[in-house]
């Protein structure tokens, strides 16, 4: 088994997938990853709709002006939602669950890509959240955060380059301009 660090460095967004379906046990593993994600006060405010139907994937791909067309080519899309009546931090809860699924996908050798829905619009300027809600009969109390598309990658991207990490965005103790040593270490 590889380390978690290696998994994180290898995970990249994939927008092009092969036609191969995802095995049912892999779908279950992806959803299990979402269900074990931590939530504020253990509220489990998230809910998910898993979509494999090709026609529905095509319709979901039209949820945004730009940046959602890849959903038509994925084998599985998971709509990630949060119950706004359960907690005011449903966005954070749902985001963690989506990220867990993406890391699980990488561990399974699958590709994934996040499609933001909340605060986005369709080509005809409808709120993307309402478009998805209407399409999938999602009740009003569930906010639609994103759709994560999964599939077998058409190609594997290069891992993140550790030397290119933006350590200057890290501040120790308080916010200040940090100096980066030649070895990539942040100097206080």
Predicted regions and their residues:
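Acidic, surface-exposed loops and disordered segments
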Residues: 1-188
């Amino acid at each position: 088994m590889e380390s978690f660090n290696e998994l994180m460095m290898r995970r990249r967004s994939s927008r092009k997938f092969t036609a191969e379906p995802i095995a049912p046990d892999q779908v279950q593993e992806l959803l299990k990853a979402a269900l074990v994600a931590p939530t504020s006060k253990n509220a489990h405010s998230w809910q998910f709709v898993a979509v494999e139907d090709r026609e529905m994937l095509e319709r979901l791909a039209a949820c945004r002006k730009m940046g959602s067309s890849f959903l038509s080519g994925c084998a599985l899309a998971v709509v990630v939602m949060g119950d706004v009546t359960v907690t005011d931090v449903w966005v954070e809860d749902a985001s963690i669950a989506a990220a867990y699924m993406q890391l699980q996908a990488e561990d399974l050798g699958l590709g994934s890509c996040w499609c933001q829905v909340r605060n986005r619009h369709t080509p005809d300027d409808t709120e993307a959240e309402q478009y998805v809600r209407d399409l999938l009969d999602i009740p009003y109390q569930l906010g639609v955060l994103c759709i994560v598309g999964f599939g077998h990658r058409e190609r594997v991207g290069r891992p993140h380059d550790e030397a290119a990490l933006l350590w200057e965005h890290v501040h120790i103790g308080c916010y200040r301009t940090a100096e980066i040593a030649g070895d990539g270490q942040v100097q206080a």
